[in-house]
Amino acid sequence: MLKSGLPRCAALAAALVMAGGLQASAAEPGLSADSIRIGSFGALTGPGYLYGKLPMNGVEVVFDEINAAGGIHGRKLQLVREDDRCDAASAIAAIQKLVHQDQVFALIGGGCSNATFAAREAIETAKIPTLIFASVHDGITQPPAPNIYSAALTSSIESEAQVLFAQQQGAKRIAMISMRDAWGRARYQPLIEILKAKGITLVADEELSPDANDATAQVLRLKAANADAVIIVLYPKPAAVYIRDAQKLGFKPLNIGQSGIADPAAFEEQVGVPGATQSFRTISQVKYTPEDAAMDKWRKLVEAKFPGDRLSVYNLFGIGSAQVLIEALKRAGPDLTREKLQAAFATIKEFKTDVHPGPVTCSQSDHRCHKSPAWLAKEPGGPIRVLGVTTVEN
């Protein structure tokens, strides 16, 4: 009797252990034996949809591919979207809904920087693992919150890359034109500090409002300063106004953009003046253009799932970020918890996605995992070209 009881005791003990493991998993919000619910926040409507809806579409096609292959440790990924309308209050409300009502396990998102920055406290308080896919505000990841990582470039990394690019192109008289809202200041101040550290004095420092319809005065001052390179810290609309007026007034410096103007083809159309973007160069978070043959696979998947859409550089933001999230989920293992996923992000080193210009590396002390912006150019009427990559060491 004693011998026959031992196997039963062992079986009972094993069952209790398994039940305990299942209960632990079940206790995690958004997690079941066969699914992981991931929340995403960003603008689904209005002009900010470029940084919200389109990256989310990229995330979703990656999730579909993973799910078709069996999921992650047997769990399928589900994406729950919430519109933050590129607005601070709406972003906070979106986080609260995803965390408390939708009960998601983790977050991937963040489009408009001002909105995401406003939501940082809500994300940190919720202790939910979060990966940013587009927002660049330094304050989102610095100082590091334990649960927030970024697969996007940050404003200080882009700012340093802009200065390095100007120097690499031989510029001697560097100027700047910028917005001074929260988004603009997040880039402007790092630029000033970087220029100071390099011993560079701007020959002109101009401000242009986000809703400006004329930049004649700013262009005339930049031209009078004989600037040979102008660092642009503007949204696409005011940047287009500046470029149009520069062309009209015969001012043709090297114009250096950033990821807020990440689609040179769309920007050329927005400027609407033949030849005006001839000397415009801009930063991209990804190393390929949507037309590149290397993106054929993703083009087919995006355009099949979202009929009428064409593959966009903003879809690629989501694709690369989703691959980083999936790598972290794999590393966290089958006995998944939020704490394990959070810890897994910090172990990602030299990870190559299908779209990032350089390897993605995260650490406990630095949650800015992407530091290798690519440079794009587009000859008027011609294709977009990738000029190279600048890796920032900071």
Question: Locations of the language-model features?
Answer:
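Extracellular/periplasmic periplasmic-binding protein-like sensory domains
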Residues: 243-318, 378-384, 388-392
